[in-house]
Amino acid sequence: WLQGREVWMFSMLYNKVEKRQEWLDCAVQGGEFLKKYGHDGNYNWYFSLDRSGRPLVEPYNIFSYTFATMAFGQLSLATGNQEYADIAKKTFEIILSKVDNPKGKWNKLHPGTRNLKNFALPMILCNLALEIEHLLDPGYLEQTMETCIYEVMNVFYRPELGGIIVENVDMDGNLVDCFEGRQVTPGHAIEAMWFIMDLGKRLDRPELIQQAMLTTLTMLDYGWDKQCGGIYYFMDRNGCPPQQLEWDQKLWWVHIESLISLLKGYQLTGDRKCLEWFEKVHDYTWTHFKDTEYPEWFGYLNRQGEVLLPLKGLFLSPTVPTGSSIFQS
């Protein structure tokens, strides 16, 4: 999970910012480590390893696969190494084969009782398709992009709920009245909208960009804590108490992804509301998440904006969100 994100970051910086040898060296070192230890031999990617490369957690998490694909896709561009390209393509094929059951045999839910489709995979595929565009057949790429756009903007986007995006629906795309079915994750929804804007730009579809920009504004207004400031982590579309104990925490990545989406929205549409919201989120982010004494940012705040955990090097806290935000800006 984490190593894939870091390999992608250093490869992307080398490809798009500056040909700095130290960035390429870091990317190749990480890529070789992942190639040797990161999967089970069939490109099922472990969630975590110990320091020597022994697996700690089985390859249940589909995002380990997506981040490996992104990593080796960018690394293949940086190095011209065909083996890296083949790893990215093979892993992408495995991801698509897992769409209906991302966790596979590690899925702990009982089948048939309450089967739900989750927003996270279609969301990340919107980004992933463009990340490895250079490796895919054009027809295959086009089909994948259209499928992702449909899932995000026609299945999880719900105009009958005021234009918000829900986190789970049933397998037929219907709303479900349960904790999972009522869940709204503002950070996921807002992050997905800058992926959709990128697709709209790539496909020359200004109406898609406009819809994604407006959805960003809707989700920010919906997810913003009117009392304490900041964006909620989890919400319930009916206003019921969410089941997640951390529902009212303020997370660094949610705010950083929001800044990216707002900047893209303003750049691509010129809508002043994006700029106004950007300044509001920017002020909150730099005031609350930045460590004024030492480098790096805090990741987790309570509802009132106070630091919950001073530890910065958590497995969900890579340099990618912050670095990506700076690059996208």
Tell where the protein language model's regions lie, with residue ranges:
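Glycan-recognition and catalytic cores of secretory/periplasmic carbohydrate-active enzymes
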Residues: W1-S329
